[in-house]
């Protein structure tokens, strides 16, 4: 039973880490577009950037929560 819970939490941690990587990549792409002259005046890019940053914050919070729960379960 405990092993099942640990495996589930490890899977959640891995999923969060994959989501963090994907979101960071998306942010980098948007930031590169924002650095161009035409991108600098594109408000949609700024809105997308803001949404991605908020999404990243949420995923990191989830990752921290699940990671702590995993550590507590292992100990």
Give, region by region, the residue ranges found by the protein language model.
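Charged, heptad-repeat coiled-coil alpha-helices that serve as long linker/dimerization "arms"
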Residues: 1-75
């Amino acid at each position: 039973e405990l092993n099942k819970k640990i495996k589930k939490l490890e899977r959640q941690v891995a999923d969060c880490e994959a989501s963090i990587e994907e979101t960071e990549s998306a942010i980098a792409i948007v930031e590169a577009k924002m650095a161009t002259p035409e991108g600098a005046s594109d408000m949609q890019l700024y809105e997308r950037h803001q949404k991605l940053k908020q999404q990243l914050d949420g995923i990191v919070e989830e990752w921290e929560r699940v990671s702590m729960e995993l550590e507590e379960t292992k100990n």
